[in-house]
Structures are given as structure tokens and as C-alpha cells.
Amino acid sequence: MTTITLVQGDITRQHADALVNAANSSLLGGGGVDGAIHRRGGPAILAECRALRASRYGEGLPTGRAVATTAGDLDARWVIHTVGPVWSSTEDRSDLLASCYRESLRLAGELGARTVAFPALSTGVYRWPMGDAARIAVETVRTTPTAVEEVRFVLFDTHAYDTFARELGDAGHAGHAGHPG
């Protein structure tokens, strides 16, 4: 069974086999987690992303899909880039958000990753409500068969951490670590 833990902090400072990047479809960096991973990871990540764009994803990486690159200068073996959906009040896109977690876990398993660190996907500029995002993330990780031993949600602020902690507590699998207090 996969252990789920929470950490409040900067995902680019985590040690894990794979760090998940909340990428945009261009794979060329951006703001938030995406920009931070590209900045701290260095040029090797961008070079591999450019190669992926040139060879397989000329139109960009589709929402809900995941691809892996080197982790560059990050303390990880791989970065798994996934494109989350933009929140919509008129269309249910939760299956796409769940797909980001499932596809990232599938890819991590194929790579042989045992520890995977996720941010709260789609909750930044894509405006997904934190409570719903936490529910989808925790439920998807709990129900997705995987060889990954630890999934660590790395949450940038207290609001995100507390929301995920409530969701984990409600799910009966409270495994918390690293909350500043």
C-alpha cells in the first residue's frame, strides 16, 4: 500500500525519485511550480522538454497526460510533467485532474520510482478550488494501483496543507510530516 505524506514547503527542495511538475502544455516553463522547477532544475530540463516538443508533442502535451525528463540539478532522478485542467464552473473537468495523478503514478511506476512528490495540481493560476483538488488528489492516489511506495504532497502554504490534512483525515489515512508549527 502506498503511504501518503504531507509536507508544507517548496517542492524544488524535496528529495524524491520523481518530482511532479504542474506544467503547461508547451512544456517550456512558466509561472508557479513550473517556473520554479525549470529555474532550480537548470537547462537540462528545458533541453529535454524542447526535444519532446520537437519529436512527440508538437502541439503540446495534452491535458491529463504526463511525460518524464531528467531532474537536472534537482534532488531527484526525474521530473514528471503533467498538464492539469483549468477550473470551469460550467464543465466538470475532474476526470482530467484525476488523470494527471493517475498518469503521473503510472509513469513513475514504469520508471521504477519509489517516492513521488506532487504539488496541488491546478490550484494556482488554473484556479481549481483547493478542497475539491485535495479530494480528487487523495482519492485518486488511494485508488490507483502503483508500485510507488510513498506519495508526498508538497504544499506551498498553510491553507493548502490544512486542506489536504483534512482530506487525509477524512479518508482515514492521516500521514503527516513537516508541518511548521
Swiss-Prot record:
NCBIfam families given in the database record: PRK00431.1-6 (NF001664)
InterPro entries: Macro_dom (IPR002589), Macro_dom-like (IPR043472)
Originating species: Streptomyces nogalater
Family to which the UniProt record says this protein belongs: Belongs to the MacroD-type family.
SMART domains: A1pp (SM00506)
Superkingdom of source: Bacteria
Record's protein name: Macro domain-containing protein in sno 5'region
Pfam families from the UniProt entry: Macro
Alphabetical list of PROSITE patterns matching this protein: MACRO
Residue ranges constituting the Macro domain according to the UniProt record: 1-172
